[in-house]
């Protein structure tokens, strides 16, 4: 047989096995006996061993790599994998849908939702180029995940090649990897028989199995996957419906949950929630709630995102698993901002497969409202199936010697006064950086990956540096020397050099990361990014007023007040000045000369409808570059309304108020002039 004949035989076998895999793993409809499948598979293996020039990465034989990886490499997602905001009650769901409707151009409309079970597994992103699986990654931080390509290939229901003749140039497919309940129980039973470690729950089992350096271990675990969405997609027209996109994924060869449903409005969503809640225990996989997504992709794009979550989707969590135990003591922890948080110490109890011995009491308002005493028998719940909390007290079991929980007058760490403002539920230590607990938490935050990212500066080393009086302020970190570090327990010269190198590397940063690292109350990553976009340096931000700050997106009155207060404190400015003197720097944005004669300069502009030549974010960026202020709502202060096709209520309101209306053609002339 010549090369062409051999290649054709290999392709025929590959196509046959793909067909068998699809019917067996996706449709649950085996086409041939196992023996026949094994014969085909063996024949393909023999061909590829004899003629390795015809071995391709999409071959069914390549699902398991024989060489374990040394580490997981980072992989950037083309489109961010954002987490969902959670709702726990009917009122929260109604509020979520109301907020979404109010932000739409046509607010008086009945929304259609795609409803899906929320699997309790591990989210993954699979990238296909030209129809072939090229890499897969975990969610990671939403922007960058870990490369688990070899491990994903061990899941038989993941197609290595899309089942279409005209695939997208590139497509990201998102899914949830899980282990079915029955397989989980069987795996643990075998592990117990062999004296091996068992998993606490199916989610841990799935995550631990997928993140194995040796993919052969992943292959030995009963992993499965359901796909729930599409990320980036190039050179392919996708349907304008999430449900239709899920059907497209099925055509591509992916498994999609058969429990996906269409629902209309709040009542439709609640009906689905009750349906899945009743069915939860009968499902072959673990779920911890349901997910609602507005079905229209164009409406999704119109709503966009807030911080790290979409405005068009949310997770409706089921009531978490609850257990009963005794509260034996209360400790107080001090956080980065001085918040004194009560923590319940409990008689250990298993809740949802996890042994719980500590639980949050939130704050003293909650303690008073629930009438919690030391010695009480309490109900523990894993809130969101993650953070254990004390839900309530069983009063009839209260012992005679039960004691009230008292707010400490002094910080349990530094002895400073603990105060509680009249309008706040949280009590705070006033010790500031004098308080070792606050300094430690502040240093940990400052060094974290999303802030200054000082690799190697972990909590154990921070404890040593603070407890031994080596570091008193954040800036002291950048004056550490080799001898001091090398003499610390468990450090040595090599570790000390690595830390000094990491400190030096961290000096080159960005303004938004630096602002986030400072730990200003109420300012997270998103808020720091907004501030950095509007103020290029500390001096200009120091001069900002509360009123000015409140004009920025995502900066409300409380956050604005904390920003102004932070930069009004002399000791904060001293630390910042010292950090800058020690070499922390970031690229200065180039000054753009704005033509003040352009018609948008200094004007308030609102965008509505769909522009045929660019997306809304691009149009907004062009307007901002021209010195305009872009607003999300029409008012008497609006100067121009840029109206694309399908403009809705904003156009009506602008007409009523006499606001100048600009069509797309005129808008393009103005921005390009």
Curated annotation (Swiss-Prot):
Pfam families assigned: BRCT, DNA_ligase_aden, DNA_ligase_OB, DNA_ligase_ZBD, HHH_2, HHH_5, Nlig-Ia
GO molecular function: DNA binding; DNA ligase (NAD+) activity; metal ion binding
Record-listed E.C. numbers: 6.5.1.2
Domain of life: Bacteria
GO CC annotations on file: cytosol
SUPFAM superfamilies: BRCT domain, DNA ligase/mRNA capping enzyme, catalytic domain, Nucleic acid-binding proteins, RuvA domain 2-like
Broad enzyme group: ligase
Gene3D superfamilies in UniProt: 5' to 3' exonuclease, C-terminal subdomain (1.10.150.20), 6.20.10.30, BRCT domain (3.40.50.10190), DNA ligase/mRNA capping enzyme (3.30.470.30), Helix hairpin bin (1.10.287.610), Nucleic acid-binding proteins (2.40.50.140)
Name recorded for this polypeptide: DNA ligase
One GO process term, biological-process aspect: DNA replication
Active site: 118 (n6-amp-lysine intermediate)
The keyword NAD is assigned to this record: yes
Family affiliation: Belongs to the NAD-dependent DNA ligase family. LigA subfamily.
Record's keyword annotation contains NAD: yes
Catalytic activity: NAD(+) + (deoxyribonucleotide)n-3'-hydroxyl + 5'-phospho-(deoxyribonucleotide)m = (deoxyribonucleotide)n+m + AMP + beta-nicotinamide D-nucleotide
Record's keyword terms, sorted: DNA damage, DNA repair, DNA replication, Ligase, Magnesium, Manganese, Metal-binding, NAD, Zinc
Cofactor entry: Mg(2+); Mn(2+)
Residues engaged in binding Zn(2+): 411, 414, 429, 435
NCBIfam families: dnlj (TIGR00575), PRK07956.1 (NF005932)
């Amino acid at each position: 047989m010549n090369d062409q004949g051999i290649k054709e035989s290999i392709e025929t076998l590959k196509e046959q096995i793909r067909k068998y895999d699809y019917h067996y793993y996706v449709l649950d409809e085996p086409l041939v006996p196992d023996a026949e499948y094994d014969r085909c598979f063996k024949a393909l293996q023999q061909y590829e061993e004899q003629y390795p020039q015809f071995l391709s990465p999409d071959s069914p034989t390549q699902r398991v790599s024989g060489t374990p990886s040394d580490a997981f490499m980072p992989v950037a997602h083309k489109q961010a994998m954002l987490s969902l905001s959670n709702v726990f009650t009917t009122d929260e769901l109604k509020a979520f849908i109301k907020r979404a409707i109010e932000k739409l151009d046509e607010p008086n409309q009945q929304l259609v939702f795609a409803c899906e079970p929320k699997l309790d597994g591990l989210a993954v992103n699979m990238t296909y180029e030209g129809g072939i699986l090229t890499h897969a990654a975990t969610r990671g931080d939403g922007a960058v995940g870990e490369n688990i390509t070899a491990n994903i290939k061990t899941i038989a229901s993941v197609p290595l090649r899309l089942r279409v003749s005209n695939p997208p140039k590139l497509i990201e497919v998102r899914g949830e990897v899980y282990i079915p309940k029955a397989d989980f129980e069987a795996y643990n039973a075998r592990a117990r028989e062999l004296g091996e470690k068992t998993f606490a729950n199916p989610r841990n089992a799935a995550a631990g199995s997928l993140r194995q350096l040796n993919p052969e271990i992943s292959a030995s675990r009963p992993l499965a996957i359901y796909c729930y969405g599409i990320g980036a997609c190039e050179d392919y027209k996708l349907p304008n419906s999430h449900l239709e996109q899920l059907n497209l994924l099925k055509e591509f060869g992916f498994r999609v949950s058969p429990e996906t449903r269409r629902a209309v409005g709040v009542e439709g969503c609640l009906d689905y929630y009750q349906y899945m809640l009743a069915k939860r225990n009968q499902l072959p996989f673990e779920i911890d709630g349901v997910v609602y997504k507005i079905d229209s992709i164009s409406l999704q794009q119109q709503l966009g995102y807030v911080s790290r979550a979409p405005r068009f989707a949310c997770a409706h969590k089921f009531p978490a698993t609850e257990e009963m135990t005794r509260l034996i003591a209360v400790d107080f922890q001090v956080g980065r901002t001085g918040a004194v948080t009560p923590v319940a110490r409990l008689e250990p109890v298993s809740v949802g497969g996890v042994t719980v011995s500590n639980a949050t009491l939130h704050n003293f308002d909650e303690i008073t409202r629930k009438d919690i005493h030391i010695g009480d028998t309490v109900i523990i719940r894993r809130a969101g199936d993650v953070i254990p909390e004390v839900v309530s007290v069983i009063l009839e079991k209260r012992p005679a010697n039960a004691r009230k929980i008292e707010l400490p007058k002094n910080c349990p760490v530094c002895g400073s006064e603990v105060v509680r403002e009249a309008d706040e539920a949280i009590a705070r230590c006033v010790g500031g950086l004098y308080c070792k607990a606050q300094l430690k938490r502040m240093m940990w935050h400052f060094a974290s990956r999303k802030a200054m990212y000082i690799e190697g500066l972990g909590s154990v080393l921070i404890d040593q540096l603070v407890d031994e009086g080596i570091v008193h302020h954040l800036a002291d970190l950048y004056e550490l020397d080799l001898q001091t570090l090398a003499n610390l327990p468990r450090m040595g010269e090599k570790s000390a050099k690595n830390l000094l190198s990491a400190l030096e590397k961290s000096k080159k940063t960005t303004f938004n990361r630096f602002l986030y690292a400072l730990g200003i109350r109420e300012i997270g990553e998103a808020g720091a990014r907004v501030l950095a976009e509007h103020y290029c340096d500390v001096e200009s931000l120091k001069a900002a007023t509360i009123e000015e700050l409140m004009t920025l997106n995502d900066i409300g009155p409380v956050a604005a007040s904390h920003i102004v207060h932070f930069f009004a404190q002399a000791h904060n400015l001293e630390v910042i000045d010292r950090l800058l003197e020690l070499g922390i720097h970031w690229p200065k944005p180039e000054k753009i000369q704005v033509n003040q004669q352009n018609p948008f300069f200094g004007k308030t502009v609102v965008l509505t409808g769909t522009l045929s030549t660019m997306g809304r974010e691009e149009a907004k960026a062009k307007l901002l570059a021209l010195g305009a202020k872009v607003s999300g709502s029409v008012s008497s202060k609006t100067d121009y309304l840029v109206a694309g096709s399908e403009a809705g209520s904003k156009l009506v309101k602008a007409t009523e108020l006499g606001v100048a209306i600009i069509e797309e053609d005129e808008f393009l002339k103005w921005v390009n002039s």
